[in-house]
């Protein structure tokens, strides 16, 4: 599913300005850019675009209230200065599984005054010597890197087992309901085009059916009457 269609699906007739959370995971951006997301999403606080084939966040709109941004499993290699310009209140950023190779690529994040948590799992930069020390030195206001603070204390609410229980428990039932609603809404989107195409054909069929429903004798009288009216009009024109 492309990103624009997924946006419509997630909104479900809500106004963009009212949305506080938006999940676009696993949809596709053919050109590697963010598509369809605009500054109308001014109230957005959580945005997830995991595995959407992103190469860049250059066209990310201004989202002044955004606090948490999930960008894992994409192909982003730089251009992070955009985040400082357009998401000034960001507190959590997940760039795991991207093409971040050098510490200096993260330098623009210094301009995010509220950034507390940064995840870079499965990025090449994590293989560098003194990786953790270097990141904490570069970003002194950062509290957690890859789920741990500078003293290797684990961040709260990051227990994988607890998260699994929540996802497989109550959230599991909600996810099933959401999936069903998404399928229904997606079918409605697909049916809209078919309905528009079918309306013209139905109009033509209705006209044919109207003629067939009229008894043959009455239809003959109606045709003769129409012809008579045309002859009278011709006579009046001659006079």
From Swiss-Prot:
GO molecular function list: histone binding
Q: Where is the composition biased (Acidic residues)?
A: 149-215, 226-239
Tell me which UniProt keywords the record has, alphabetically: Chaperone, Leucine-rich repeat, Nucleus, Repeat
Q: Which Gene3D superfamilies match?
A: Ribonuclease Inhibitor (3.80.10.10)
Tagged with keyword Transmembrane helix: no
Its domain comment says:
Histone binding is mediated by the concave surface of the LRR region.
Q: What is this protein called?
A: Acidic leucine-rich nuclear phosphoprotein 32 family member B
Instruction: Specify the species.
Output: Xenopus laevis
């Amino acid at each position: 599913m492309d990103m624009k269609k997924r946006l419509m699906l997630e909104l479900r007739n809500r106004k963009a300005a009212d949305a506080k959370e938006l999940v676009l995971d696993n949809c596709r951006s053919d050109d590697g850019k963010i598509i369809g997301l605009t500054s109308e999403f001014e109230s957005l606080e959580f945005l997830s675009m995991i595995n959407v084939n992103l190469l860049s966040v250059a066209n990310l709109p201004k989202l002044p209230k955004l606090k948490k941004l999930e960008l894992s499993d994409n192909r982003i290699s730089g251009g992070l200065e955009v985040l400082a310009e357009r998401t000034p209140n960001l507190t959590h950023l997940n760039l795991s599984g991207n093409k971040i190779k050098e510490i200096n690529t993260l330098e623009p994040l210094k301009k995010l005054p509220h950034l507390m948590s940064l995840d870079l799992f499965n990025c090449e930069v994590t293989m560098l010597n003194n990786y953790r020390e270097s990141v904490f030195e570069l970003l002194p206001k950062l509290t957690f890197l890859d789920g741990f603070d500078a003293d290797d204390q684990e961040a709260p609410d990051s227990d994988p087992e607890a998260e699994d229980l929540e996802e497989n428990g109550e959230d599991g039932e909600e996810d099933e309901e959401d999936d069903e609603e998404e399928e229904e809404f997606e079918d409605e989107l697909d049916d809209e085009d078919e309905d528009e195409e079918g309306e013209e054909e139905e109009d033509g069929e209705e006209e044919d059916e109207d003629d067939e429903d009229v008894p043959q004798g009455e239809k003959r009288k109606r045709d003769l009457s129409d012809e008579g009216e045309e002859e009278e009009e011709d006579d009046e024109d001659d006079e």
